[in-house]
């Protein structure tokens, strides 16, 4: 929408491009130059494609900016130049890829002395990478012509951006054949051997790290590519070279040459770990196993790698005993002399990866060196090193779960066997795993009993003990583990059995308790809610005596409030019953029950609307809501429920509008109206039948009484006692007690009325009094309007009503009802009608 209607401000670049002397820097100073370039601004692209402009853009990237410039704007133009050249504009990519002079100028950045400017190196790498991805053939051909390209890459491998460029060269070329050509070219240039030579104690730490990361990424990318391309005829030459035994031996000889350099050792171990992992691990500490029966080279470890590592297991074991020297480390727990160090931690990771391969020869060498015993000693010595504890736990779990491998034919025996699993026997007999677990557990309990802190390895120790118990019950070595436990001394075996039953069982029970509510599942929430509903605070959480409650108890909840229903609610129910037929009525299946009925207005109702406006008619919706809320909570008899009975047998033949508030007032003088509206009265019993009997005709209040407010009559009977202190109570007390039914008083005029209107008066029980209404009938429209005889207008008001008839206002709060043909003939009498009386808002 913003761009469609051209609401954005016009760019200043078009104005600048119209000038003949505009310079590149002036355009680069504009804030929206990048947006215009990516939006394919034709004039801007044509300007940038000029030879001098492209040369300037490349120069900004490869040349060091002046030192005396402000640091805030020093790299402004190099950054914008890089973004313009990498905006992926096809014309610009074509010009750069085809112009060898520009490529040579860009390539000259590698000719600078090391170390390179890291920021400019990132700009250079980004531009060359997008050219490799968009113009692979031209760029690769150009780089192949440069004999020193690989040498320069190795020279600047300490710069991270150059390492990224090497990896982009391996990944950005998508066509299979060009990619294979690049791999063969790099393999011929001995890129693997050169990277391995960098992992040497004599080299810098940055070069160690970047060279190691490059080799690791080459291994991962090659294996992923092999998995994706199953029908590849040619193996990955770089991966095959790196997996050669002589290459691994060269790598290990570099790190163990003379002095021990931690950076070189850690970098070399990272390469070995990558070669030993068949696929990328899903999470730290977990090595994904190749699916059974899958012999793909990407899912197996090369035997040459294992043989090369096996020859150096003694050197790795010496690193566990004598790591590179590290200074004493002060921690919040205490002094570490020496600390574990990154070297020993990575050696233990290497041992866990070797155990994952389950090679019998390597397992035998580890047993002879007692490497498992050494790492177990470190487990209990360094109490708070959770990285170490995790790796030791993995090693023990692998030994317990690894099936026995036959050394003669290399087959793996899956069934339970007490065969010569020497490493497992070594773990229980020589390393005394059971005894050390029991000793560490007792030491921790004594320390905690004295008020000391719990040892940091207790969680891992619990998991190791559970792993032993699990291996005893099931697993490939269950029979051997059971035999090894039986061979323990009687005292140790009894202590172990007691430990598993008591201490370990209690710990597992405590650890399995959920931190959240125990019955947090949805199917349990309903029953608990029913049982605990209404409990006191001190008893709310007590669930000991709560049994399983069936779901059927939901129906026992009673949400009914024993409060008095206001007149508005009863009136609404009466309206619904009259306007909506029952849904089981077969005769109304085809009738839309929500269809609006036609509402006819008589001149009497219009005259009333224009002349009888009162405060009650002008009340707001908020006042109605407040009144409804107040009525809802009024006290009343719990056994009496007053509702208007409506005959539902006859179809509705009249419609009504109940949009106006139905306030109630008694037939009291005007000065008492409003003060007795909310008074509480004693309810009177009402008859269930005969509510529309017109045989009882009684005189209503005197027509000479003063005019009362034009408020609707309460449409339900109330027989509550009248408060003698409320105004108007005396007037109510003087009236005779009326029966519990309503009597309609009908009157009809003769031929004198030009409108041929009929009037019927009705006596309504309003609390403890009677109130008479007038029913005006229009013969033309057959509509009836109820009016109160109290609402008399003077002669001057009659004149005002006639004026209002000429300009009627929108009719509000009218209720008209067409007479049904089956109306009783007793409804018409000889009493003359009073056309000037305002009608009452609301039906009976």
Curated annotation (Swiss-Prot):
GO cellular component: cytoplasm; nucleus
Biased composition (Polar residues): 695-721, 819-844
Stretches of the chain forming a coiled coil according to its record: none
Segments of skewed composition (Acidic residues): 615-626
Modified residues (Phosphoserine): 315, 550, 588, 605, 693, 824
Function: Regulatory subunit of protein phosphatase 6 (PP6). May function as a scaffolding PP6 subunit. May have an important role in maintaining immune self-tolerance.
Subunit structure, interactors included: Protein phosphatase 6 (PP6) holoenzyme is proposed to be a heterotrimeric complex formed by the catalytic subunit, a SAPS domain-containing subunit (PP6R) and an ankyrin repeat-domain containing regulatory subunit (ARS). Interacts with PPP6C and ANKRD28.
Protein name listed in UniProt: Serine/threonine-protein phosphatase 6 regulatory subunit 3
Lineage: Eukaryota, Metazoa, Chordata, Craniata, Vertebrata
Protein's gene: Ppp6r3
């Amino acid at each position: 929408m913003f761009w469609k209607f051209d609401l954005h401000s016009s760019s200043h670049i078009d104005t600048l491009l119209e000038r003949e002397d505009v310079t590149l820097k002036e355009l680069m100073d504009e804030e929206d130059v990048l947006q215009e370039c990516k939006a394919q601004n034709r004039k801007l692209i044509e300007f940038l494609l000029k030879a001098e402009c492209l040369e300037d853009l490349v120069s900004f990237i490869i040349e060091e900016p002046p030192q005396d410039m402000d640091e805030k704007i020093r790299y402004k133009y190099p950054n914008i130049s890089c973004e313009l050249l990498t905006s992926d504009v096809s014309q610009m990519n074509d010009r750069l890829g085809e112009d060898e002079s520009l490529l040579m100028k860009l390539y000259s950045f590698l000719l600078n002395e090391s170390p390179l400017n890291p920021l400019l190196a990132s700009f250079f790498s980004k531009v060359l990478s997008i050219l490799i991805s968009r113009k692979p053939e031209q760029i690769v051909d150009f780089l192949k012509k440069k004999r020193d390209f690989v040498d320069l890459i190795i020279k600047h491998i300490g710069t991270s951006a150059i390492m990224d460029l090497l990896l982009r060269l391996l990944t950005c070329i998508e066509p299979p054949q060009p990619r294979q050509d690049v791999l063969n070219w790099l393999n011929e240039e001995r890129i693997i051997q050169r990277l391995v030579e960098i992992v040497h104690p004599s080299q810098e730490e940055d070069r160690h790290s970047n060279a190691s990361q490059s080799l690791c990424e080459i291994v991962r990318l090659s294996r992923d590519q092999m998995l994706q391309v199953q029908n590849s005829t040619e193996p990955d030459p770089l991966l095959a070279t790196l997996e050669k035994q002589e290459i691994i031996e060269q790598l290990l000889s570099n790190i163990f040459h003379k002095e021990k350099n931690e950076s070189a050792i850690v970098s070399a171990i990272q390469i070995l770990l990558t070669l030993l992992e068949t696929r990328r691990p899903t999470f730290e500490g977990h090595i994904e196993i190749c699916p059974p029966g899958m012999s793909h080279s990407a899912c197996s470890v090369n035997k040459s790698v294992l043989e090369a590592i096996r020859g150096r297991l003694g050197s790795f074991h010496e690193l566990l005993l004598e790591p590179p020297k590290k200074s004493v480390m002060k921690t919040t727990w205490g002094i570490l002399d020496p600390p574990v160090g990154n070297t020993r931690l990575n050696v233990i990771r290497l041992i866990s990866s070797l155990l994952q391969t389950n090679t019998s020869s390597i397992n035998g060498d580890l047993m002879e060196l007692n490497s498992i015993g050494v790492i177990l000693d470190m487990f209990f010595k360094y109490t708070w090193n959770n990285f170490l504890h995790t790796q030791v736990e993995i090693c023990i779990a692998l030994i317990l779960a690894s099936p026995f491998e036959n050394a003669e034919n290399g087959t793996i025996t899956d069934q339970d066997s007490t065969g010569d699993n020497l490493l497992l026997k070594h773990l229980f007999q020589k390393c005394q795993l059971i005894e050390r677990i029991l000793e560490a557990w007792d030491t921790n309990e004594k320390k905690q009993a004295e008020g000391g802190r719990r040892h940091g390895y207790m969680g891992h120790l619990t998991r190791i003990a559970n792993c032993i118990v699990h291996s005893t019950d099931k697993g490939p070595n269950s029979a051997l583990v059971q035999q090894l436990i039986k061979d323990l001394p009687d005292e140790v075996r009894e202590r172990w059995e007691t430990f598993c039953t008591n201490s370990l069982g209690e710990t597992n029970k405590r650890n399995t308790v959920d931190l959240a509510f125990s019955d947090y599942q949805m199917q349990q929430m309903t029953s608990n809610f029913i049982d605990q509903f209404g409990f006191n605070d001190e008893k709310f959480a007590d669930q000991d005596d709560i049994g399983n409650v069936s779901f059927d108890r939901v129906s026992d909840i009673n949400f009914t409030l024993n409060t008095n229903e206001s007149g508005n609610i009863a009136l609404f129910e009466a309206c619904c019953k009259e306007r909506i037929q029952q849904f089981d009525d077969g005769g109304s299946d085809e009738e839309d029950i929500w269809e609006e009925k036609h509402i006819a207005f008589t001149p009497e109702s219009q005259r009333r609307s224009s002349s009888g406006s009162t405060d009650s008619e002008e009340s707001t919706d908020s006042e109605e809501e407040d009144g409804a809320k107040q009525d809802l909570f009024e006290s009343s008899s719990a056994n009496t429920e007053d509702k208007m009975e409506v005959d539902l047998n006859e179809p509705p033949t009249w419609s009504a509008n109940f949009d106006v508030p139905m306030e109630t007032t008694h037939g009291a003088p005007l000065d008492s109206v409003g003060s007795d509206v909310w008074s509480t009265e004693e309810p009177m019993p009402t008859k269930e039948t005969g509510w529309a009997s017109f045989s009882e005709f009684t005189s209503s209040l005197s027509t000479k009484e003063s005019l009362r407010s034009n408020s609707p009559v309460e449409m339900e009977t109330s027989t509550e006692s009248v408060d003698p202190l409320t105004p108007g109570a005396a007037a109510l007390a003087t009236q005779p007690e009326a029966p519990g039914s309503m009597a309609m008083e009908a009157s009809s005029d003769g031929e004198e009325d030009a409108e041929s209107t009929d009037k019927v008066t009705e006596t309504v029980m309003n609390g403890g009094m009677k109130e008479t209404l007038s029913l005006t009938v229009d013969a033309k429209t057959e509509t009836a309007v109820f009016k109160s005889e109290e609402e008399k207008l003077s002669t001057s008001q009659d004149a005002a009503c006639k004026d209002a008839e000429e300009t009627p206002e929108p009719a509000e709060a009218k209720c008209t009802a067409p007479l049904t043909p089956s109306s009783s003939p007793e409804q018409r009498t000889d009493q003359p009608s009073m056309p000037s009386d305002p009608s009452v808002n609301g039906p009976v």
